[in-house]
């Protein structure tokens, strides 16, 4: 019985990895990474690292358990941190390229008469428990009608009424210097 459960678990993990591989292949994530300036500097390819990071929530893992303390990965945690923090990598461009490809696929699956819209949203990004985050500010939350620690998150997204895809986003601090709790370090 125990072997059967282990076998099913392994098969489910293989199916999940195959689905992620198919997604990365169908949307040519490697090409999009390259167009976004995210290239292999040394060691492991960025596609391999991004797949390993991308699959974490589907496996029920966080970054620490899936990358930092997992010795089965082909790369070390420092390589993953270097990929995510690379100052020359244009993650916003990657998001836009990927969103455009997904919008094209959704366009084939939906009715031509369906209305498509761009949505601009400025939600509050709450960081109430943070103290030393760069440009942390007191921002006004219009839904709760109070000030809180955090940022404004400006998001531009595409929607067809049933789906929403973020195209770009930015975290905004307060324009007023007196409302900023932390400066630039």
Q: Which stretches of residues belong to each language-model region?
A:
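Conserved, well-structured functional cores that handle cations and Mg-NTP chemistry
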Residues: 1-185
